Amino acid sequence: MKQDTLEGKTKTKNGIKRLCFSIICILLEVIFIITIVTRLNEYAEIINLFTRILSGILVLRLYASDKTSSMKMPWVILILIFPIMGVGLYLLIGLNGGTHKMRERYAEIDSKLLPMLPDNQECLSRIKEKIPKAGNIASYIQRNSWYPIYQNTDIKYFDEAVKGLEAQLEELAKAQKFIFMEYHAIEDAEAWHKIQDVLEERVKAGVEVRVFYDDMGSIGFINTDFVKKMESIGIHCRVFNPFVPGLNLFLNNRDHRKITVIDGKVGFTGGYNLANEYFNYTHPYGQWKDTGIRLEGDAVQSLTVTFLEMWNAVSEKATNDTDFSKYIIHYDYKAQQTGFVQPYADSPMDNEQVGEEVYISMINKAENYCWFMTPYLIITDEMTHALCLAAKRGVDVRIITPGIPDKKFIYNITRSFYHGLVKHGVRVYEWTPGFCHAKMSIVDDCMATCGTINLDYRSLYHHFENGCFMADCQAVVEIKNDLIRTMGECRDVTDQYCTGRSAYLRLGQLFMRLFAGLL
């Protein structure tokens, strides 16, 4: 045990070293670009002309893009005021969505996978008839992301991540055919070791096991030999978008999804990653609040497709699936529940912000109340307007954010949004026991979401995300009850941020808000 602990500490230290190395490499790339241009003094006029032309082209490109003004303005200001630095940063992290070749690869895989999902028009008609406002949102998701609405699915909500982990371990042990796991962060520590022990047993029983994680999300948690270690015990493992020094147009796009699929029958998703802090095994930021859901039935097909998309698109050199049908299976399952559920995914590979549009649609459809829980609150003008307009219509709009931050700078930006919201009637609560990482929304006792999508630019525009839209089911009731309990542990900071702020504080917050879209 002591040896394992020492080994774990060594791996964590190596991961932190690699994180520091990655940050240093990015800074060196920016410095290199600036230095090259600056030192060519004898060509100052040519360089100046070239920089101005390039800056102008980039500004025009930004202006003509489909991005919101909140996304465009910071880059335009940065490029115009500091052309060399602005152009360098934009080339490194501002080009959202990867290369044309990469987008083609994702589109090709989607063209094979997504049509394998059922159309479920009868189910869509039923939800439109029973709950018209939820039906409209379900229709939007299906028309713009291919993911259909389902019934014949039992839904279990977990108000604590550790409950989700326990349920996952139980279901993983029952696997007979395959296990798919996709997570933003995996920590080679206690929580993962529990999962790994079960996975090893299932591999020995002939079960196919695949594990997929984001390189930057896990960089401080595991060492580079993790993939080799998994492969040595029979677990197929791939890494999303590994950091490599050099110009990477895909660097800012991370896989933030959290999915487990067992035999195509049972699926899990939610806000938690597979690291100790999510289950309160460690407490770096006080108590950790996270949530998740378990699906059993027809809707698991969508989670399977979401996993297979990323697994097969991550590398054109890897050996990929040629027959998806053996994983997308329709079982003769009879659910006890009759509610509606719609797992969906969002991608920076297209110009459709499904995650944000679902949230805004729910806000616009709200008649009585609309509540959110999010770890970060860094939102566009469009979402700000929707929240404020709902509050001005008399809708009870509430947002729960952490009382203890994981990133103080980001927390200050989150708080900079409070005043603009509360002055129009939105109520803001901070969860005093610690850090709430859950990403949930609920409207009028009839529909809710639970998944990976934060109320911030990175989730809404840059990351690969997934969520679960639910309506007319017990999970919606349980989410509401959980939010009420959570608000009982919060401090209501609405009145505190209604009052005016000092000029110094306003200036600082305006500066941070200006560049919020770059984060």
What do the PLM-derived regions correspond to, one by one?
Residues Y376-V397, P402, K407:
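Helical hairpin unit composed of two closely spaced alpha helices linked by a short loop
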